[in-house]
Curated annotation (Swiss-Prot):
Pathway: Phospholipid metabolism; phosphatidylethanolamine biosynthesis; phosphatidylethanolamine from CDP-diacylglycerol: step 2/2. Its EC number is 4.1.1.65. This is Phosphatidylserine decarboxylase proenzyme. The record marks G225, S226 as: Cleavage (non-hydrolytic). It is found in: Cell membrane. Its cofactor is pyruvate. The gene is psd. It comes from Bacillus cereus (strain ZK / E33L).
Length: 262
């Protein structure tokens, strides 16, 4: 009953019109009135911001802010996979041969997440990693490795929240929400970077258009907090053992190691 009521509430309020109104407000000068309160409530680290708080004219500008030069360093080890975002490490684990994985008791389909069987088959037996971005985090997304971009595509329309309630009661938000996917071929092995939209504000802006990408290079930004899912082929990586659920991650921090193949 609780799950049904939750989903009904989301469906009734999470339409195109609602999203449009909220997006327009966030991009308007009127939204600047709540910037100080927003920064205080979400405890935004103002020392890292490229500009002073008063220089942001709209909430959208604050959401998509850049960091001061040198505030993040990208792990330079050739075998490292780095966090593509600032966020909270949610989970990681194996992708079953059935092309599914489990998070918090809910089963997710890679076929649904990527849109078809052919794409999903690449990741059967591989590894998934999930990183959650709250409204307080830096919202720009960077590449976790270097390689050639093989595909970019968008799926889904509406979005459930990706907080604890959304993960428990929502309709498989990681594989059904509005999402933008970038696939990268790195030395013959594939990784999918799945950028999952948050409730109401689905916008994910792509910034990278070249055929190749370097580790740490900026690729896109969220216009609000959301989630990133990383999918890796079988025997491609080993997740850093020290990573724990709930741990804060910073852009460029090593999260996995590429496995050597003879």
């Amino acid at each position: 009953m609780r799950r049904t009521l939750y989903r009904l509430m989301i469906e009734l309020t999470n339409g195109r019109f609602t999203s449009y109104i909220l997006r327009k407000f966030a991009q308007s000068r009127l939204s600047s009135i709540i910037i100080p309160s927003y920064a205080k409530v979400f405890q935004i680290n103002q020392d890292e911001m490229e500009k002073g708080l008063k220089e942001y004219r709209t909430l959208h500008e604050l959401f998509t802010r850049k960091l001061k030069e040198g505030k993040r360093s990208i792990d330079t080890d050739a075998s490292s996979i780095v966090s593509p975002v600032d966020g909270v490490f949610a989970d990681h684990g194996p992708i079953e041969d059935t092309k599914t994985f489990d998070i918090k008791g809910k089963r997710y389909s890679i076929v649904d997440m990527l849109g078809n069987e052919e794409r999903a088959q690449r990741y059967a037996g591989g590894t998934y990693m999930v990183i959650y971005l709250s409204p307080s985090h830096y919202h720009r997304i960077h590449s976790p490795l270097s390689g050639s971009v093989t595909e970019r595509f968008v799926l889904g329309r509406k979005s459930y929240p990706v907080n604890a309630a959304g993960m428990e009661y929502g309709k498989e938000p990681l594989s059904k929400n509005y999402r933008s996917v970038t696939e990268v071929n790195s030395d013959g092995e594939h990784m999918a970077l799945v950028k999952v939209g948050a409730m109401f504000v689905n916008s994910i802006e792509l910034l990278h258009e070249r055929d190749t990408v370097q580790k740490g290079e900026e690729m896109a930004y969220f216009t609000f907090g959301s989630t990133v899912v990383l999918l890796f082929e079988k025997d491609m990586i080993e997740v850093v053992k020290e990573l724990k659920s709930g741990q804060e991650l910073r852009l460029g921090e090593k999260i996995a190691t590429r496995l050597a193949h003879k």
